[in-house]
Regions:
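N-terminal binding-site loop/beta-alpha segment at the start of enzyme catalytic domains
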Residues: 1-70
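A short alpha-helix capping/helix-coil boundary motif
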Residues: 5-9, 81-84, 115
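Short glycine-enriched loops at secondary-structure junctions
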Residues: 13, 75-77, 104
């Protein structure tokens, strides 16, 4: 497995920052790939749990082979927000939470594996 020398962070691509459209995310992906930056860093909670889906929707419309890019994701923080039933911010590293987070990331990123 080879990652690009610089990893592109997506934390502020969604509602926590620029609130990019699908088209803008596609431009960011294209620009990254033009510079040979092929590794994209995600976390389940980015954008109140919406940024991975935004990225997945954008990427799935592009004609880029999945094996030509790397997707990294993280989990463990339960953040209160509209689309989650967490009452307080907390950390959860249980096997159940990790497996659930990974499954959600796979679905949102529209991929069958994480790198």
């Amino acid at each position: 497995m080879k990652f690009s020398p610089i990893i592109i962070g997506t934390m502020r691509w969604g509602i926590w920052g620029a609130n990019h459209s699908i088209k803008n995310v596609q431009k960011l992906i294209e620009t990254s790939l033009t510079e040979e930056l092929t590794t994209f860093d995600h976390a389940d909670l980015y954008g109140d749990y919406t940024t991975e889906k935004l990225f997945g929707d954008a990427f799935s419309e592009m004609k880029i082979k999945r094996e030509d890019v790397q997707f990294i994701s993280k989990c463990g923080i339960e953040m209160p927000c509209e689309n989650r039933n967490f009452k307080i911010k907390s950390y959860n590293y249980s096997k159940e939470h990790i497996l659930n987070s990974v499954q959600n990331s796979l679905e949102n990123l529209k991929t069958d594996y994480l790198d």
